[in-house]
Amino acid sequence: MSELPPRPRLAALQMMATYGLPQEATADKFVWHDAGPFKRINVTKAEHHHDFPLPHMDYLEHTIDYRVPADKAAALSAYDGSLTFDRTRGEMSARCDLEGHNILTLNLAHDIVTGKKDTEEARQAFGHTVVEDFKGKYPADVVTLRVDPSKKGTTYADQPVIPGSPKRAATVTDDSKKNDDAEILAFVAVVDMNEILAADQAAKEKVNPQVMQYAKKLHQEHGTNLEQTLMLGQRNGVTPILTPAVDTMRVKGATELATLVPLDGDQFGKAYLAAMIKGHTEVLAMLDTKLTDAESEAVKRHLTETRQHVTQHLEEARKLQTSMKD
């Protein structure tokens, strides 16, 4: 608390008096979760100049669950530069120096979304209400949030634009689409994506030229295989489905890559090769299992071709590992 400048410190103490101790506290900010009608409240050490509706500093932010329609995004941005929203997470935030003025910001933003006010009307209403507030009249829009911050249905996952993209299992309502081939193609796609991410990380490291060349090859070939996997699904009318098992594999890839990132130079190179040997060995075993589960001949052929590439990658990794020991 002592590290906060005077104004943010005052805001933090005011929030503590109303909502209790914050759930998060660092040298740079305090955070409250599920405080009153708000999803989140932030008080930051950083202060930013903001001249609407009159000059002040921004350091206090209130966030609610709220779905902003795409066609209202520009109007909201023009209304108040300190009003922000995240359509993916389904959130809208107001940042100012007073809680009441953040409540006002959110109330008038809701009026814009619902068509009760346009941008300029909301801006003028904001200024008028602040003047009334300064006169001690306690306008309702400064005291009470008119928005029902429902915590359901505000998120927006958007839509894929890459042809043949996998779908999350929860979004597939037609059970006939949830066949073995749909999950198998998703497994192959996730394997490719995991290898692409690992190769991309290797490209950022100072590894020896042989390891770098190997990583670039894997990046290109797994990228091509990913494209072919998605195209196959399109041709066969099978959309890859991200089942919980597929997602577990994706998380496994991230977990293993996270152990490599802190390493540098030769240490990274050796660990990367060891990970490729382990990972490709596991993928071969998975492909053998999926070959027996596949329903269409086209998917079986693709798995066989993928297996050939994975086998080659495994052999090259083993040779590189041996050469680095010599």
Roles of regions detected by a PLM:
Residues 1-29, 34-39, 47-173:
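Non-cytosolic coordination micro-motifs
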Residues 43:
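Catalytic domains of cell-wall/extracellular-matrix polysaccharide-remodeling enzymes
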Residues 170-326:
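His/Met- and acidic-residue-enriched segments that coordinate or traffic transition-metal cofactors
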